[in-house]
């Protein structure tokens, strides 16, 4: 049964923000505002880069749909502010958000539960020598991936195919983060799988297989070209897809995520073993975004998806009577 639109109260769609992914967030948020309004919900755009978060309280907002991406949006920062304001919000809580945005912490948590993720080496700004950078090639082999530990949308990511390119790749990643993740490259199918819900009620949506030009699924190919192919149904054997969905649900629960998320996975071409790369706790909602695409394959329209996500808005610390403000 669909909830009465008025039961949501006045909704702020947080969008824009201060991260390197601001442009994408504005695109996501605009789509969400339009979708919620089409369902009769009193939704308003709210850019934390231009307005004080305190206005959410004084403005009478009852809950927030977080369409922010990257720093200050999906890293636990805005979630903590909303906890203090007592305004329920979509997506994961403070701790899960801060863990999931950090690719190294995510890997450590996954490995603690024996979930597969590519081998890696962590570099910290100012804490490594050229010789140590060079040695990473011997440790992980070529090609390998170098990326900032806490950025999304493939920003600052390099695929290193020769030893001489390592220093430049590390320097690029270091411009965006003090922590640099050097990761084993898994050659094979690149897939992604969204999750909707919380706890035991969480469910995995259809897997999407991504085929990018020259295998390069970078920022440009993610959002601004039509040459990347998104295959859903993914074309994998049913058993493989089910195994990926189960693995993604395990990862979602390991990080204590809630509401919704999307996990990126590589499938080793030789062994067909899936490897978890990262979990995005505030996925994109643009025209090129993958969660709406997967939801559509499951029979869920963009508008219905936005309402479904909004219904999951919570606080880490609920009032004693379990009610929402």
UniProtKB/Swiss-Prot annotation:
Pathway: Cell wall biogenesis; peptidoglycan biosynthesis. Pfam families: Dala_Dala_lig_C, Dala_Dala_lig_N. Its cofactor is Mg(2+); Mn(2+). PROSITE patterns: ATP_GRASP (PS50975), DALA_DALA_LIGASE_1 (PS00843), DALA_DALA_LIGASE_2 (PS00844). Mg(2+) 2 binds at residues 278, 280. Cell wall formation. Keywords: ATP-binding, Cell shape, Cell wall biogenesis/degradation, Cytoplasm, Ligase, Magnesium, Manganese, Metal-binding, Nucleotide-binding, Peptidoglycan synthesis. It comes from the Bacteria. InterPro entries: ATP-grasp (IPR011761), ATP_grasp_subdomain_1 (IPR013815), D-Ala_lig_Van_CS (IPR000291), D_ala_D_ala (IPR005905), Dala_Dala_lig_C (IPR011095), Dala_Dala_lig_N (IPR011127), PreATP-grasp_dom_sf (IPR016185). GO terms for molecular function: ATP binding; D-alanine-D-alanine ligase activity; metal ion binding. One of its GO terms (biological process) is cell wall organization. Mg(2+) 1 binds at residues 264, 278. SMART domains: GARS_A. One of its GO terms (cellular component) is cytosol. SUPFAM superfamilies: Glutathione synthetase ATP-binding domain-like, PreATP-grasp domain. Binds 2 magnesium or manganese ions per subunit. This is D-alanine--D-alanine ligase. Its EC number is 6.3.2.4. It catalyses: 2 D-alanine + ATP = D-alanyl-D-alanine + ADP + phosphate + H(+). Gene3D superfamilies: 3.40.50.20, ATP-grasp fold, A domain, ATP-grasp fold, B domain. Residues 107-311 form the ATP-grasp domain. The keyword Nucleotide-binding applies.
